[in-house]
Amino acid sequence: MTARRVVATGTFDILHPGHVYYLTESRKLGDELWVIVARDENVKHKPRPILPEAQRLAMVSALRPVDHAILGDHTDMFCPIDDIRPAVITIGFNQYFDEEKLKGQLAERNLPAEVVRIGKYEDGDLASSRMIVQRIVEARGSGDQRIG
């Protein structure tokens, strides 16, 4: 029997509870969770990652829900998906994907994966890298050396 593979993608810069939630919920949708970590050069929709891609990959690989983690392709985001052949592709609540367009692109490549958007993590106010960076800047800028 073939394992039901799930693919989750993201930058995963400054890991936080929202990332863990996204990956945990993604893992529940199949037997294997494959995570494609964005390459530094391909992050164009937001500021460049603070952590280099190799470190982000190592951290994601160490997370309990993750069975396999790889770096994305340099030029074609669908190349790893072609290789993995997932049953499901998950996208985070705030990822900039047009779900219908993504479904069309998958169909064009004969990749019949279901696309599932994972909901927002609601158990804390520091569930995004942007909010964490903002909190650090505010704390350090005010002379307060405590983050929490």
Swiss-Prot record:
Which pathway is this protein assigned to? Cofactor biosynthesis; FAD biosynthesis; FAD from FMN: step 1/1
* NCBIfam families, per the entry: cyt_tran_rel (TIGR00125)
- Encoded by which gene? ribL
> Per UniProt, where does ATP bind?
T11, F12, H16, P17, G18, H19, N94, Y121
Entry keyword annotation includes ATP-binding: yes
Q: Describe the family membership recorded for this protein in Swiss-Prot or TrEMBL.
A: Belongs to the archaeal FAD synthase family.
Q: What does the UniProt function comment say about this protein?
A: Catalyzes the transfer of the AMP portion of ATP to flavin mononucleotide (FMN) to produce flavin adenine dinucleotide (FAD) coenzyme.
Catalyzed reactions:
FMN + ATP + H(+) = FAD + diphosphate
Where is the chain membrane-spanning? none
> What's an example GO BP annotation here?
FMN metabolic process
Q: Does the keyword Nucleotidyltransferase apply?
A: yes
Q: Which InterPro entries match?
A: Archaeal_FAD_synthase, Cyt_trans-like, FAD_synth_RibL, Rossmann-like_a/b/a_fold
- Binding partners and assembly: Homodimer.
Q: Which cofactors?
A: a divalent metal cation
Name of the featured protein:
FAD synthase
Q: What keywords were assigned to this record?
A: ATP-binding, FAD, Flavoprotein, FMN, Nucleotide-binding, Nucleotidyltransferase, Transferase
MF GO annotations: ATP binding; FMN adenylyltransferase activity
Q: What EC identifiers does the entry list?
A: 2.7.7.2
Pfam families assigned to the protein according to its UniProt record, in alphabetical order: CTP_transf_like
Which major enzyme category is it?
A: transferase
Q: Residues of the signal sequence?
A: none
